[in-house]
């Protein structure tokens, strides 16, 4: 393997500077408590007893919040989770969404009040009303409510929303944290993640996004025992600011059984780790935003921006089609010095909707950010001519049982690829990235729905066989996508749209079944891009760095370094890509076609 280190300027912890709220953030517990006491005292001037709520996203460590609650010296603390249904009842009532599959559940469309016993809620509501009605001394009273969905009990005078990113929730699952109101500490990570993905995060997000305007404060609980508090006004203002300028999210990295060495070498990752397989740098549903306010950093889920400012972020055309959901996903797959990914397929739209309740599917593409130059590199893509469906199914079943190895090259095309090639993978196409490649994967966001057909006879990082879904997979394969179809439709489809001395604009992707359009800009000078009422997601696939500049000065020049993913909200309208002086760059930009 020939692994060449590039520029070494990838930012692992990008911070987005927010202006205008420098005095509305606190990162010391003592300061946080003092600020909350000040807010309570202001409310006590209006009414004798104040209600302050700490409303928790599932996964927030309640013991840390109770420490803050007790420091406020309230007259009484109410925990809404005392009103929750017991674990057995919750499992029974949500069993249809959990299913008995190791990986897949069904998207839950219930609301968060279904987690609680209505009679217990009513009893606690009355207790709060009674406590509030009691005469207090001249300083006024204080009731604190703690837990998930506190607004089901009472509308707070001071509402402190305690936020947390999905990635941090997953890390806590790995360290032993159970699901919400559960005791499944030792369950497999896949089990916990499934309940989070299909149930808990859906209900919690549905509840949260209706209440942004009510937040008096936002509490960042990402780092253990290091909370950061900002005002609701500053939090909302920060999101509005980002909705009108380019931004990056904080990437995260994870090892995998097939993982490689490219990211470790080029991004300066932990050298003690065996490998890194994935980088998620463009997934708002899981990535975080680092908001730098007055020299302090507030970490919040990027999904908050999607929920709070969907029109500005996505554009009217995209919002009209997808609602408050970010439809484009960028991630990196590193097999440099690693192994093949699993052989897999994604379901068609009707299948994913009927089986899992998802409104659209995971069409995707592989852009070759880099590839080993010393040996042949390839992707497995589509079926060979004349494949016998029954025979292939029989051999896959035998391989799943461990009776034989699946002869992938007997059935699946092995397509040679090189750096900067772009192959399209509409749902229903069998595919797999080969070893010694660095892939920028561009896909629609229902990313959990990958049906593995064959995993090369290996075990996962947990020492267990990785889940195979032959039943779903065989029903999803489009058997007409053979060698000829592959070369006619999804390989070598790049077309030049514009070419001048300093600029070449190429469409590298947009199969007729896919909604994500990809344009590659090869530039040695400034180039203006019009957005057509859609969010843009971009990655600098060649070159040290480039600037994204405003056409009217509405935002400061924004630098994107090699291999970084950045997002330009639709509200920007038009922007300019500017290479470093004397350098040729390639910027790949995805949008909704």
Name each region found by the language model.
Residues 411-424, 549-572:
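Short acidic-glycine-tyrosine-enriched beta hairpin
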Residues 35-39, 212-390, 455-496, 502-504, ...:
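Transition-metal
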Residues 325, 335-340, 347-349, 372-374, ...:
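Ligand-binding loop in jelly-roll beta-barrel domains
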Residues 128-182:
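ATP-dependent NMP and nucleoside kinases share a basic, alpha-helical "lid"
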Residues 2-27, 31, 75-141:
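ATP-dependent small-molecule kinase phosphotransfer cores
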Residues 402-456:
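Loop-centered beta-sheet repeat module
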Residues 380-407, 442-481, 581-593:
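Double-stranded beta-helix
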Residues 2-46, 64-73, 175-178, 196-261:
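NTP-dependent small-molecule kinase module
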